[in-house]
């Protein structure tokens, strides 16, 4: 029998390219399982195989515990120390028992356990092999095409055969069709250690694919002379990528385009002809958005840092180009910059600002007990809300011509009183529908919008997580994109426990 064990270890180790120690451990586990099946009671068994001779010994063991709940597998510390005073809780007491003989049932049980353990070892090796390659481009051969995904064989160093990866349908480009035997490239974006199912996940549609292709085609990126700051994609159609240089002598956009467009064309070809805009990064968010809106010319831009939005004005003749087909250009620019962008004509922006200024003047005259001329001065100085007047540093108000400290103090006091009155009126009108603390504390949601949600019965994070974008579509000041972000943030906290 000992020779058979050594032969099995050698054969499986060679066939699966697994370490011999892993096979010995699998065999020991298999023999222990087979031994347990010989007993009517549930016992704990350990098998030890001699790595040189193949002989094995079998031991029944009891775990030392403070209080016994399973007499067939546990023993008290007091009883264990009758045999050995050095033992402690958590140690084992062992007695050697007769080893199993390999009849048909024992062999079948051992085989099942060995197969399972070998499979677990193989999956562990896949994780170890590819963990360091996560985020990099890999090349694979299409093994099987399914309706929802395709299976790839990826070359794996140090393993018998190839590892299997999966590209889900959403990770492929639109209209992209593959057949068994095709060689394709993609970014390995997930390596999962789960005991069942796919372990390696590859994508061709995520922005990381675009970034890694440029890293291959543009040596300056690998040398860290040029840095990729952000990327946004409408897979298979259009993309934008933001780059900056760490060497002022090098033009990052020109380097990424390449001689006669060779570098960007190579990336575009790999992505099915995807049009790629290379955008110059700027630390100034407004200037960066102007760059990202290319090829459209921006006439003016207004930044609202509190709401993290920008109003972009273009000439009427450029409006269609600025928005892009189905909103593609402005959507990609928004994703690239991380700002919510509102594109409109110069006339529309002027009309909007006039309406906002008129509304602010009305609020100031109504709640601050000042005349229209004074209210107009405040608006022209950049103040548009009661909150700004109530809490802005006093020195900013004192910079306005004609205002002294007593006037500023009185103005701030009136603004605070007005805010308190409005808050009380708002809460009274809501009745029981008031936003809970968890909703008020949600990042990206201001107090005003929280009360608007509460007025619709969305009072808690759970309520928000249960909403769809269409449910919130008619709330003033809430775009579909912003609604989607808030809903997903609530779901991440409520459903997935993400407190970040």
Swiss-Prot record:
Organism field: Salmonella typhimurium (strain LT2 / SGSC1412 / ATCC 700720)
HAMAP family: NusA_B
Segments passing through the bilayer: none
InterPro entries: DNA_repair_Rad51/TF_NusA_a-hlx, KH_dom, KH_dom-like_a/b, KH_dom_NusA-like, KH_sf_prok-type, NA-bd_OB-fold, NusA_bac, NusA_N_sf
Gene3D superfamilies listed in its UniProt record: 3.30.300.20, 5' to 3' exonuclease, C-terminal subdomain (1.10.150.20), Nucleic acid-binding proteins (2.40.50.140), NusA, N-terminal domain (3.30.1480.10)
Family the entry assigns: Belongs to the NusA family.
Sequence repeat residue intervals: 369-419, 444-494
KH domain residues: 307-373
Lineage, broadest ranks: Bacteria, Pseudomonadati, Pseudomonadota, Gammaproteobacteria, Enterobacterales
Protein name: Transcription termination/antitermination protein NusA
NCBIfam families: NusA, nusA_Cterm_rpt
SMART domains in alphabetical order: KH (SM00322), S1 (SM00316)
Ranges where the record places region 2 X 51 AA approximate repeats: 369-494
Job of this protein: Participates in both transcription termination and antitermination.
Keywords of the record: Cytoplasm, Repeat, RNA-binding, Transcription, Transcription antitermination, Transcription regulation, Transcription termination
Any one GO MF annotation of this record: RNA binding
Complex and partners: Monomer. Binds directly to the core enzyme of the DNA-dependent RNA polymerase and to nascent RNA.
PANTHER family named among the record's database cross-references: TRANSCRIPTION TERMINATION FACTOR NUSA (PTHR22648), TRANSCRIPTION TERMINATION_ANTITERMINATION PROTEIN NUSA (PTHR22648:SF0)
Pfam families the record matches: HHH_5, KH_5, NusA_N
Any GO CC annotation of this UniProt entry: cytosol
Compartment list: Cytoplasm
Residue span(s) of domain S1 motif: 135-205
GO biological process, one term: DNA-templated transcription termination
